[in-house]
Amino acid sequence: MRVGFIPLTDCAPLAIAAAKGFDQKYGITLVASKEASWAAVRDKLVAGELDAAHILYGLLYGLELGIASKPQAMANLMTLNRNGQAITLSSELQEKGVTDLGGLKRLIDRSAPGSYTFAHTFPTGTHAMWLYYWLASAGIDPFNDVRTVVVPPPQMVMNMRIGNMSGFCVGEPWNARAINDRIGFTAATSQDIWPEHPEKVLGTRRDWVERNPNTARALVAALMEAQRWIAASPENTRETARLLARRGWLNTKEQYLTGRMLGEYDNGLGRRWQDAHPMRFWAGGEVSFPWLSDGMWFLTQFRRWGLLKQAPDYLAVASRINRIDVWQAAAQAVGGISAPAVRMRSSTLMDGTVWNGSDPEGYARHFSIQRKGA
């Protein structure tokens, strides 16, 4: 099986499944394919060059709905991780007195619109949604007050170093790397925005699942085993970091990976803490469950930011993409994993808004800052 990934910490389940033989246990061989950008992952997945991929949650939903591309029937087989992304602001902003979101708001208020550029990794991706939500929570319109651009994750630090952006939202290890290189600081983690949010998923095409149901189940089972192994002990997490640092995976220094994988944070401004919501892979198997409300949340944000001009059938879209049936079959094969009794979960985001999937269109339209024409 050829499975694509972007060199980010949260591709860890793929690395461990291959290294520890969990793929072989379920009768498959996982061949990991490192890709340069999320656009490359999308194109190869659609073309059939990849069987499946470590992919941004929102990217999968954007593909299904044909946002900026031809619609493609997609499937989310499992969530690979929660939490663990961040927003980095540049040292240049710090020199202007910005150390938090409030300071950024004050600077932008006294500047011409579009004076500052912020990067994310894909227009419908998780990082775009975290960045937009964070900015808007302080009254900063991400489409009018600032400029936003798309940059592949491995290129974020380089682009900040040469002054192409004032901030970015990306996965690890690039936020930790920016601090190490003294070019930026962590202004917020993604779990500050939404504690226990979904992040990367195992994505594929629906026709592939229909043709290969047993292989799909085996792949999910192997990755569940890998998730469980990573979370079993701090030493397993450290070993995972050592593996990910190798050339075939992230090709970086172990020190950029280990701390934040263990929930040990340093924001680059002197604050250190043990995060209550670190990058999470297991939690008794609950992390991997493809909650319908998680997928529906991304649809609400597509509506908010004008990516969907008409209200979708939120529940129907999530129900056809999130393959709970495949997850259940894999969980049974692995053993010791109980499926949640419900398909929705409730979360409270940074602005106090509760999301539980009960009124998605009302939720999408209640925000004071929305993209004009949405």
Task: For every predicted segment, state its role.
Residues 296-374:
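Conserved C-terminal helix/tail region of periplasmic/extracytoplasmic solute-binding proteins
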